[in-house]
Amino acid sequence: MQTGSQSTPGRNLFLRSSSLKTKPAAFVLPLMAAALLCFIGVGRSSGRNGGRPVPAQDDQSNEVSRAAIENFWTIYHGNDYAGIPEAQRELETAIQSDPNNPTLYALLGATHFWHVGEMTRDPNALADKQIFAQDMPTAAALFQKALDLDYYTQHPIGYINDDHLPGYLGITTVHTGQEYQNQSLIAKGDGILDFAVYQFPEFNNLNRWAAHLDDARDTATYQEALDSLWQGIDACIGTHIDRANPDMKPYLGLVTGVGRKKACWWKGDIAPYAFEGLILNLGNGLVKAGQIDAARVMYANARNADNYETWPYRSVLESIAASDLNARAAQYAPGATKNPPPLNVPNRSCVYCHATVPEPASHYRPTRELRP
Protein backbone atom coordinates (compact mmCIF):
# COMPACT_ATOMS: atom_id res chain seq x y z
CA MET A 1 0.00 0.00 0.00
CA GLN A 2 1.23 3.45 -0.85
CA THR A 3 1.02 6.51 1.32
CA GLY A 4 -0.68 9.61 0.03
CA SER A 5 2.65 11.21 -0.84
CA GLN A 6 3.76 8.33 -3.00
CA SER A 7 3.36 8.38 -6.74
CA THR A 8 3.29 5.20 -8.73
CA PRO A 9 5.45 5.71 -11.82
CA GLY A 10 2.95 6.17 -14.64
CA ARG A 11 3.29 5.03 -18.21
CA ASN A 12 3.34 8.52 -19.68
CA LEU A 13 6.51 8.58 -21.74
CA PHE A 14 6.98 6.66 -24.96
CA LEU A 15 10.11 6.71 -27.04
CA ARG A 16 9.75 4.88 -30.31
CA SER A 17 12.85 2.95 -31.20
CA SER A 18 13.46 5.25 -34.17
CA SER A 19 13.86 8.21 -31.81
CA LEU A 20 16.79 6.54 -30.11
CA LYS A 21 19.04 6.66 -33.12
CA THR A 22 21.90 9.09 -33.21
CA LYS A 23 20.52 12.40 -34.47
CA PRO A 24 21.98 15.82 -35.26
CA ALA A 25 21.41 18.37 -32.52
CA ALA A 26 18.85 20.29 -34.61
CA PHE A 27 16.56 17.25 -34.53
CA VAL A 28 17.21 16.17 -30.95
CA LEU A 29 16.09 19.41 -29.29
CA PRO A 30 12.49 19.24 -30.60
CA LEU A 31 12.39 15.55 -29.70
CA MET A 32 13.41 16.23 -26.11
CA ALA A 33 11.02 19.17 -25.83
CA ALA A 34 8.21 16.79 -26.75
CA ALA A 35 9.48 14.21 -24.28
CA LEU A 36 9.59 16.82 -21.53
CA LEU A 37 5.99 17.84 -22.21
CA CYS A 38 4.95 14.23 -21.81
CA PHE A 39 6.96 14.07 -18.61
CA ILE A 40 5.19 17.05 -17.12
CA GLY A 41 1.89 15.25 -17.60
CA VAL A 42 0.54 16.19 -21.03
CA GLY A 43 0.38 12.54 -22.05
CA ARG A 44 -1.05 10.62 -19.14
CA SER A 45 -1.94 6.97 -19.50
CA SER A 46 -3.99 4.50 -17.55
CA GLY A 47 -1.34 2.05 -16.32
CA ARG A 48 -2.89 -0.89 -18.19
CA ASN A 49 -0.95 -2.91 -20.70
CA GLY A 50 -2.59 -0.98 -23.53
CA GLY A 51 -2.57 -3.94 -25.89
CA ARG A 52 1.17 -3.97 -26.32
CA PRO A 53 2.49 -7.34 -27.45
CA VAL A 54 4.18 -9.62 -25.00
CA PRO A 55 7.95 -9.63 -25.60
CA ALA A 56 8.76 -12.39 -28.04
CA GLN A 57 12.29 -12.92 -26.76
CA ASP A 58 14.45 -12.05 -23.80
CA ASP A 59 18.06 -10.94 -23.68
CA GLN A 60 19.25 -14.50 -23.25
CA SER A 61 17.94 -15.46 -26.69
CA ASN A 62 19.07 -12.34 -28.45
CA GLU A 63 22.79 -12.35 -29.13
CA VAL A 64 22.88 -8.70 -30.12
CA SER A 65 21.17 -7.65 -26.91
CA ARG A 66 23.37 -9.84 -24.76
CA ALA A 67 26.53 -8.51 -26.38
CA ALA A 68 25.39 -4.90 -25.94
CA ILE A 69 24.54 -5.49 -22.28
CA GLU A 70 27.84 -7.20 -21.56
CA ASN A 71 29.77 -4.45 -23.31
CA PHE A 72 27.95 -1.79 -21.27
CA TRP A 73 29.07 -3.43 -18.04
CA THR A 74 32.62 -3.81 -19.33
CA ILE A 75 32.75 -0.09 -20.10
CA TYR A 76 30.95 0.94 -16.90
CA HIS A 77 32.97 -1.19 -14.51
CA GLY A 78 36.09 -0.36 -16.49
CA ASN A 79 35.68 3.36 -15.70
CA ASP A 80 35.83 4.00 -19.44
CA TYR A 81 33.92 7.28 -19.83
CA ALA A 82 35.33 7.54 -23.34
CA GLY A 83 33.48 4.34 -24.20
CA ILE A 84 30.02 5.84 -23.64
CA PRO A 85 29.35 6.48 -27.37
CA GLU A 86 30.25 2.88 -28.19
CA ALA A 87 27.91 1.58 -25.49
CA GLN A 88 25.13 3.83 -26.77
CA ARG A 89 25.53 2.69 -30.36
CA GLU A 90 25.40 -0.98 -29.40
CA LEU A 91 22.38 -0.56 -27.13
CA GLU A 92 20.51 1.48 -29.75
CA THR A 93 21.26 -1.18 -32.37
CA ALA A 94 20.03 -3.90 -30.03
CA ILE A 95 16.78 -2.03 -29.39
CA GLN A 96 16.00 -2.12 -33.12
CA SER A 97 15.79 -5.92 -33.04
CA ASP A 98 14.70 -6.35 -29.41
CA PRO A 99 12.36 -3.39 -28.76
CA ASN A 100 10.55 -4.90 -25.76
CA ASN A 101 13.66 -5.52 -23.67
CA PRO A 102 13.55 -3.19 -20.62
CA THR A 103 17.21 -3.77 -19.77
CA LEU A 104 18.34 -2.17 -23.02
CA TYR A 105 16.39 1.03 -22.33
CA ALA A 106 17.55 1.14 -18.72
CA LEU A 107 21.21 0.81 -19.61
CA LEU A 108 20.90 3.32 -22.44
CA GLY A 109 19.38 5.71 -19.91
CA ALA A 110 22.31 5.02 -17.60
CA THR A 111 24.77 6.05 -20.31
CA HIS A 112 23.11 9.46 -20.58
CA PHE A 113 22.98 9.85 -16.80
CA TRP A 114 26.68 8.96 -16.58
CA HIS A 115 27.59 11.24 -19.48
CA VAL A 116 26.08 14.39 -17.98
CA GLY A 117 26.98 13.48 -14.40
CA GLU A 118 30.69 13.36 -15.20
CA MET A 119 30.84 15.92 -17.99
CA THR A 120 34.20 17.32 -16.88
CA ARG A 121 35.77 14.12 -18.22
CA ASP A 122 34.81 15.20 -21.74
CA PRO A 123 37.55 17.37 -23.28
CA ASN A 124 34.94 18.58 -25.79
CA ALA A 125 32.59 19.74 -23.03
CA LEU A 126 32.15 23.25 -24.41
CA ALA A 127 31.26 21.96 -27.87
CA ASP A 128 28.95 19.34 -26.34
CA LYS A 129 26.86 21.76 -24.26
CA GLN A 130 23.70 21.03 -26.26
CA ILE A 131 24.23 17.31 -25.78
CA PHE A 132 24.65 17.67 -22.03
CA ALA A 133 21.42 19.69 -21.89
CA GLN A 134 19.61 16.78 -23.54
CA ASP A 135 21.17 14.02 -21.45
CA MET A 136 19.05 14.27 -18.28
CA PRO A 137 15.60 14.40 -19.93
CA THR A 138 16.74 11.68 -22.34
CA ALA A 139 17.80 9.49 -19.41
CA ALA A 140 14.48 10.10 -17.67
CA ALA A 141 12.51 9.20 -20.80
CA LEU A 142 14.49 6.00 -21.26
CA PHE A 143 14.06 4.98 -17.62
CA GLN A 144 10.32 5.60 -18.01
CA LYS A 145 10.24 3.33 -21.05
CA ALA A 146 12.21 0.65 -19.21
CA LEU A 147 9.86 0.84 -16.24
CA ASP A 148 6.80 0.64 -18.50
CA LEU A 149 8.10 -2.56 -20.05
CA ASP A 150 9.24 -4.01 -16.74
CA TYR A 151 6.15 -3.21 -14.66
CA TYR A 152 3.28 -3.11 -17.14
CA THR A 153 3.82 -5.85 -19.71
CA GLN A 154 3.31 -9.57 -19.31
CA HIS A 155 6.25 -11.71 -18.24
CA PRO A 156 6.83 -15.42 -17.67
CA ILE A 157 5.91 -16.86 -14.28
CA GLY A 158 8.75 -16.20 -11.86
CA TYR A 159 9.82 -12.92 -13.45
CA ILE A 160 11.11 -10.45 -10.85
CA ASN A 161 10.46 -6.76 -11.46
CA ASP A 162 13.46 -4.46 -11.26
CA ASP A 163 12.71 -2.11 -8.38
CA HIS A 164 15.82 -0.07 -9.09
CA LEU A 165 13.93 1.49 -11.99
CA PRO A 166 11.55 3.77 -10.04
CA GLY A 167 14.58 5.21 -8.28
CA TYR A 168 16.35 5.94 -11.56
CA LEU A 169 13.20 7.47 -12.99
CA GLY A 170 12.62 9.54 -9.88
CA ILE A 171 16.08 11.04 -9.62
CA THR A 172 16.31 11.90 -13.31
CA THR A 173 12.84 13.43 -13.17
CA VAL A 174 13.88 15.64 -10.26
CA HIS A 175 17.11 16.62 -11.98
CA THR A 176 15.24 17.39 -15.21
CA GLY A 177 12.90 19.61 -13.23
CA GLN A 178 15.87 21.34 -11.62
CA GLU A 179 17.49 21.83 -15.02
CA TYR A 180 14.35 23.48 -16.41
CA GLN A 181 13.41 25.16 -13.09
CA ASN A 182 10.08 23.35 -13.21
CA GLN A 183 8.74 22.92 -9.67
CA SER A 184 5.87 20.65 -10.68
CA LEU A 185 8.29 18.27 -12.36
CA ILE A 186 10.51 18.27 -9.26
CA ALA A 187 7.46 17.43 -7.15
CA LYS A 188 6.51 14.66 -9.58
CA GLY A 189 10.00 13.19 -9.27
CA ASP A 190 9.88 13.39 -5.49
CA GLY A 191 6.63 11.44 -5.53
CA ILE A 192 8.19 8.77 -7.73
CA LEU A 193 11.14 8.58 -5.34
CA ASP A 194 8.80 8.08 -2.39
CA PHE A 195 7.26 5.14 -4.25
CA ALA A 196 10.74 3.86 -5.10
CA VAL A 197 11.77 3.91 -1.44
CA TYR A 198 8.59 2.06 -0.54
CA GLN A 199 9.51 -0.60 -3.10
CA PHE A 200 13.25 -0.90 -2.35
CA PRO A 201 14.42 1.19 0.64
CA GLU A 202 17.92 -0.28 0.83
CA PHE A 203 18.77 1.14 -2.58
CA ASN A 204 16.38 3.94 -3.42
CA ASN A 205 16.97 5.99 -0.28
CA LEU A 206 20.32 6.83 -1.87
CA ASN A 207 18.52 8.15 -4.95
CA ARG A 208 16.18 10.22 -2.77
CA TRP A 209 19.26 11.71 -1.09
CA ALA A 210 21.05 12.39 -4.36
CA ALA A 211 18.06 14.26 -5.76
CA HIS A 212 18.42 17.02 -3.15
CA LEU A 213 21.96 16.83 -1.76
CA ASP A 214 22.79 20.24 -3.25
CA ASP A 215 19.87 21.98 -1.54
CA ALA A 216 20.79 24.54 1.12
CA ARG A 217 21.63 22.87 4.40
CA ASP A 218 18.91 24.63 6.41
CA THR A 219 16.09 23.69 4.04
CA ALA A 220 13.53 21.03 4.81
CA THR A 221 14.36 19.26 1.55
CA TYR A 222 18.01 18.87 2.55
CA GLN A 223 17.14 17.59 6.00
CA GLU A 224 14.73 15.08 4.46
CA ALA A 225 17.37 14.00 1.96
CA LEU A 226 19.92 13.45 4.73
CA ASP A 227 17.36 11.48 6.71
CA SER A 228 16.87 9.27 3.66
CA LEU A 229 20.46 8.06 3.99
CA TRP A 230 19.82 7.18 7.62
CA GLN A 231 16.65 5.37 6.59
CA GLY A 232 18.65 3.43 4.02
CA ILE A 233 21.07 2.20 6.68
CA ASP A 234 18.18 1.35 9.00
CA ALA A 235 16.64 -0.77 6.23
CA CYS A 236 19.96 -2.51 5.69
CA ILE A 237 20.56 -3.46 9.32
CA GLY A 238 16.96 -3.96 10.39
CA THR A 239 17.10 -1.50 13.26
CA HIS A 240 17.57 2.18 14.09
CA ILE A 241 21.28 3.02 14.04
CA ASP A 242 22.56 5.51 16.62
CA ARG A 243 22.61 8.85 14.81
CA ALA A 244 25.18 10.34 17.21
CA ASN A 245 27.58 7.37 17.12
CA PRO A 246 26.80 5.43 13.92
CA ASP A 247 29.40 2.69 14.36
CA MET A 248 28.53 -0.12 11.95
CA LYS A 249 30.89 -2.78 13.31
CA PRO A 250 28.12 -4.46 15.34
CA TYR A 251 26.22 -5.12 12.10
CA LEU A 252 28.98 -6.59 9.94
CA GLY A 253 27.56 -10.06 10.44
CA LEU A 254 24.73 -9.00 8.14
CA VAL A 255 26.98 -8.48 5.12
CA THR A 256 25.70 -10.41 2.11
CA GLY A 257 26.18 -10.64 -1.62
CA VAL A 258 22.71 -11.97 -2.45
CA GLY A 259 19.21 -10.56 -2.49
CA ARG A 260 18.22 -6.96 -1.98
CA LYS A 261 20.52 -6.45 0.98
CA LYS A 262 23.57 -6.76 -1.25
CA ALA A 263 22.86 -3.15 -2.27
CA CYS A 264 23.96 -2.18 1.25
CA TRP A 265 27.39 -3.74 1.24
CA TRP A 266 30.48 -4.54 -0.80
CA LYS A 267 29.64 -8.05 -2.00
CA GLY A 268 27.52 -7.12 -5.03
CA ASP A 269 28.91 -7.41 -8.53
CA ILE A 270 26.96 -4.46 -9.99
CA ALA A 271 28.18 -1.84 -7.51
CA PRO A 272 31.12 -3.42 -5.67
CA TYR A 273 31.92 -0.19 -3.81
CA ALA A 274 28.34 0.74 -2.91
CA PHE A 275 29.15 0.65 0.81
CA GLU A 276 32.10 2.99 0.49
CA GLY A 277 30.06 5.32 -1.70
CA LEU A 278 27.26 5.41 0.87
CA ILE A 279 29.70 6.16 3.69
CA LEU A 280 31.32 8.98 1.71
CA ASN A 281 27.94 10.57 0.96
CA LEU A 282 26.60 10.29 4.50
CA GLY A 283 29.85 11.45 6.09
CA ASN A 284 29.95 14.50 3.84
CA GLY A 285 26.24 15.10 4.35
CA LEU A 286 26.72 15.12 8.11
CA VAL A 287 29.57 17.61 7.80
CA LYS A 288 27.31 19.87 5.75
CA ALA A 289 24.72 19.61 8.53
CA GLY A 290 27.34 20.50 11.14
CA GLN A 291 27.33 17.05 12.78
CA ILE A 292 31.10 16.66 12.84
CA ASP A 293 31.51 13.95 15.49
CA ALA A 294 29.00 11.66 13.79
CA ALA A 295 30.70 12.32 10.45
CA ARG A 296 34.06 11.15 11.81
CA VAL A 297 32.51 7.88 12.96
CA MET A 298 30.83 7.49 9.59
CA TYR A 299 34.05 8.02 7.61
CA ALA A 300 35.78 5.38 9.76
CA ASN A 301 33.09 2.85 8.83
CA ALA A 302 34.43 2.68 5.28
CA ARG A 303 37.47 0.75 6.47
CA ASN A 304 35.21 -2.12 7.51
CA ALA A 305 34.71 -3.09 3.86
CA ASP A 306 36.77 -6.08 2.75
CA ASN A 307 37.57 -4.32 -0.54
CA TYR A 308 38.32 -0.88 0.90
CA GLU A 309 42.02 -1.03 0.00
CA THR A 310 41.20 -1.60 -3.68
CA TRP A 311 38.60 1.19 -3.92
CA PRO A 312 39.78 3.47 -6.74
CA TYR A 313 38.47 6.59 -4.94
CA ARG A 314 39.71 5.78 -1.45
CA SER A 315 42.01 8.80 -1.40
CA VAL A 316 39.04 11.17 -1.74
CA LEU A 317 37.42 9.94 1.47
CA GLU A 318 40.72 9.82 3.33
CA SER A 319 41.71 13.36 2.38
CA ILE A 320 38.33 14.72 3.51
CA ALA A 321 38.34 12.75 6.76
CA ALA A 322 41.83 14.05 7.59
CA SER A 323 40.92 17.67 6.85
CA ASP A 324 39.57 20.39 9.14
CA LEU A 325 35.94 19.31 9.14
CA ASN A 326 34.73 22.32 11.08
CA ALA A 327 36.21 24.61 8.45
CA ARG A 328 34.64 22.45 5.75
CA ALA A 329 31.24 22.66 7.45
CA ALA A 330 31.48 26.44 7.59
CA GLN A 331 31.58 26.56 3.79
CA TYR A 332 27.96 25.34 3.65
CA ALA A 333 26.63 28.19 5.79
CA PRO A 334 24.21 30.56 4.03
CA GLY A 335 26.18 33.10 2.04
CA ALA A 336 29.56 31.56 2.89
CA THR A 337 30.56 30.63 -0.65
CA LYS A 338 28.91 30.11 -4.01
CA ASN A 339 30.80 26.86 -4.58
CA PRO A 340 30.90 24.75 -1.40
CA PRO A 341 32.64 21.35 -1.59
CA PRO A 342 30.61 18.63 -3.33
CA LEU A 343 29.18 15.85 -1.18
CA ASN A 344 30.44 13.02 -3.36
CA VAL A 345 33.60 12.47 -5.40
CA PRO A 346 34.15 15.81 -7.18
CA ASN A 347 32.76 15.78 -10.72
CA ARG A 348 31.85 12.10 -10.51
CA SER A 349 28.39 10.61 -10.21
CA CYS A 350 28.47 6.89 -10.96
CA VAL A 351 31.94 5.45 -11.05
CA TYR A 352 32.91 5.76 -7.41
CA CYS A 353 30.43 2.98 -6.56
CA HIS A 354 30.58 0.98 -9.80
CA ALA A 355 34.08 1.21 -11.28
CA THR A 356 36.46 -1.59 -10.40
CA VAL A 357 39.59 0.13 -11.74
CA PRO A 358 41.04 3.65 -11.65
CA GLU A 359 40.27 6.10 -14.40
CA PRO A 360 42.23 5.42 -17.60
CA ALA A 361 44.24 8.13 -19.30
CA SER A 362 42.34 8.25 -22.57
CA HIS A 363 40.84 10.74 -24.97
CA TYR A 364 37.10 11.09 -25.19
CA ARG A 365 35.43 10.23 -28.47
CA PRO A 366 32.60 12.65 -29.38
CA THR A 367 29.16 11.44 -28.31
CA ARG A 368 27.40 12.82 -31.37
CA GLU A 369 28.60 13.84 -34.77
CA LEU A 370 27.03 17.25 -35.37
CA ARG A 371 26.11 17.91 -38.98
CA PRO A 372 24.84 21.11 -40.59
Language-model segments: residues:
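TPR/Sel1-like alpha-solenoid repeat signature
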Residues: Y105-H112, L142, L282, L286
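Canonical tetratricopeptide repeat
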Residues: Y105, I157, P166, L206-N207, ...
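Short coil/linker segments at helix-helix boundaries
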Residues: G47-P55, D59, E63-E90, A110-F195, ...
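N-terminal secretory signal peptides that target proteins for export/translocation
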Residues: M1-K23
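The canonical Cys-X-X-Cys-His
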Residues: P346-P358
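Short coil turns that delineate tetratricopeptide repeat
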Residues: P99, Y151, Y198-E202, I237, ...
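Helix-start (N-cap) detector for alpha-helical repeat units in TPR-like alpha-solenoids
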Residues: S61, S65, P102-T103, Q154, ...
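Bacterial N-terminal signal peptides
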Residues: V28-F39
